[in-house]
Structures are given as C-alpha cells and as structure tokens.
C-alpha cells in the first residue's frame, strides 16, 4: 500500500522494541502497520490511533501526532481512551484461539498503539467474494469456532457489536479469527441502560437499530 507523509516510515522504532516495516491498511480512525517484534524476532501487526480529520503529522520532521484544532483536543483524548479500552478488551481473551491476540499496547508520539499477532490470510468478506457460494455444512464448520469464541466473550459480560465478514479473518489452514473490538462494550456495566448505536446494515441485530434497544446476549 502506498504510504504518505503521515504514516510512520519503514525503520521507525517504537519503545525500543518494535520496528515498522510498512503499512498494511488505513481507516478513518487508524493506521495498521506490519512490524517486527525485535525481542521475539517475529512479525506483528501494529495499530496506531490516528483519526483522520482531527490529527495530522509530517514524518519528514517528527513522529508525534498533532491535534489539528484546539477544540478537538477533548474528543481526541476520549477517542484515544476508547482505543486503549479496545486493547484491554482484546487482552482479556488472549488465550482464545478464535480471537486475534493483543500482545501489547502503549502510548507514545501523543497517540496510542496496539500490537497484535500478525495473521496471513484474507477477510471473510474477501473469502466469500472469491468462493461465492459455500455449502451449508462447510459454512457451519467454518463458523462453529467463532460461535464458541462469542460464547466466551459473552460469558465475560462483553458484547462485540460489530460482527461482520470484514471483521473475521480466514487463515490459510481454514481457521478463523475475530478482529476489531473497537465497538465492544461491557453490557453488565450498563444494566438496563441503552448503548450507543453501532451497526452494519444486514449484520447487526434488531436492537442495535434502536436508540433505546437493550443490548446483550
């Protein structure tokens, strides 16, 4: 993927341990890099909190992220805390083989980073595009591990809230992994209170379409 002036350069080191090798992907709220964990000598994926339109950076001069407008500073800090909360949520399920592992997380460069296991494979969205139709028995075999992982997540009082083909990774050996816990919430924390609306049309349950829909397993 083509890099730009706000993506960290190849060779950049973070906390003296992780080296940036390139950009894997970019979204509205962050940049994901291919990195090397120098301590364990293995590839990792490094997700950087970088909400476009709120922050900027020119890597020709510095690696530090700058909030574009003073009035956005509070929103940026709240967003960064939610990002770190995502890391803590993922870390709770590091022993579950059906969930992408969060290996480390930290703050530096006036932003935050999540270090995750690096996975070779494609998203379920890409898989479905390439394979088009999947036999029911094959689909069940594919999804049972995901359902078991969701059962574990729910048993800990959490809901993912963003289950969709683009948040599920299919590995070369056929195993799948659930990704992206940015919308996850502890439903026991809210009791009968409603949660914010987060959904993907066609995949979200009916209660997520409602402002006061009670969410939970």
Predicted feature descriptions by range:
Residues 109-123:
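Conserved short submotifs of the Hanks-type protein kinase catalytic core
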Residues 194-208:
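Conserved activation segment of eukaryotic-like protein kinases, specifically the C-terminal portion
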Residues 146-158:
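Protein kinase catalytic-loop region centered on the HRD/HxD motif
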């Amino acid at each position: 993927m083509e890099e730009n002036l706000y993506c960290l350069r190849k060779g950049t080191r973070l906390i003296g341990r992780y080296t940036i090798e390139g950009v894997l992907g970019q979204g509205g709220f962050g940049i994901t890099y291919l990195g090397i964990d120098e301590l364990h000598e293995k590839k990792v994926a490094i997700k950087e909190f970088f909400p476009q339109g709120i922050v900027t950076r020119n890597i020709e001069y510095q690696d530090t992220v700058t909030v574009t407008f003073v009035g956005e500073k509070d929103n940026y800090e709240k967003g960064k805390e939610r990002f770190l909360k995502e890391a803590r949520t993922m870390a709770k399920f590091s022993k579950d083989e059906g969930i992408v592992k969060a290996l480390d997380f930290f703050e530096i460069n006036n932003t935050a980073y999540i270090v995750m296991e690096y996975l070779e494979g494609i998203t379920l969205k890409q898989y479905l595009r390439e394979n088009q139709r999947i036999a029911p028995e094959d689909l069940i075999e594919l999804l049972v591990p995901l359902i078991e992982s969701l059962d574990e997540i729910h048993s800990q009082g959490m809901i993912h809230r963003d289950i969709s083909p683009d948040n599920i990774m299919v590995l070369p050996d056929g195993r799948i992994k659930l990704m992206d816990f940015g919308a996850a919430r502890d439903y026991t924390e809210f009791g009968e209170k409603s949660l914010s609306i987060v959904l993907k049309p066609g995949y979200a349950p009916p209660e997520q379409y409602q402002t006061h829909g009670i969410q939970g397993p």
